[in-house]
Amino acid sequence: MKQTRSPLYPIFLFVIINLIIFTLSRLGLAIWQADRVSAVAGWGQLFLQGLRMDIVALCYLFGVPALFTVLFHNSRIWKMILRIWLTLGSVFILFMELATPAFIETYDFRPNRLFIEYLIYPKEVFSMLMEGHLTAVIFSLIFTVVAFFCYWKLSGYAVRNLRPMSWKWRPVVALLVIAVAFLGARSSFQHRGVNPAMVAFSSDGLVNSLVLNSGYSVLYAAQQFKDEGASSEAYGKMDTDEMLRIVKASRGR
């Protein structure tokens, strides 16, 4: 069979699929919360900024594999790694969107740092889910498992018949991929890249959270946790009794 597909075909295919999933999920959530979206006249901003944040998320997720695909698309080992990356990344995106309605119903927000914090107490969370969202949990798990096999099969189709690229062009295309992924992930020419605060446009926290996608929201929260942990190390540790003694001494007690 002729090798007619661009080496980046698998990346483009999965980017388009996940953009569709993001958009359909956001549309469904917006229709569900239509009164609140309309109350802040947020329909246009919601989908415009939402598309922006989806592109940011996909550039972070698929930027690195796009680069390596340009360089090693003829390698069987890399094709297997790429299939795993495309499949697991897409399953994560789908699972987080499926988990979103139940989370919003409980916390009035997309999955965020609370999603991570409650993972520390899996028994309590599992009990709560079984009592209040059993149907949603079963549906999400079944759909996620089915999606895994579908994505895996689709990734196998996507990496077939890729057209070889001359080595003299690979560095050039690789630089273009780096530039596009970097600019897409930052989505801003300011000193700092885009973040949730930059795309918030209303006083309604839920509507602002709908601009994001749930995978990005959770991973951004995880990064904040990491940064908080790193910053706390600068202050060292102190025994509670010693801390109280110093405070009392400073107040003359």
Label the model's feature ranges.
Residues 211-253:
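Membrane/wall-proximal cationic-aromatic binding patches
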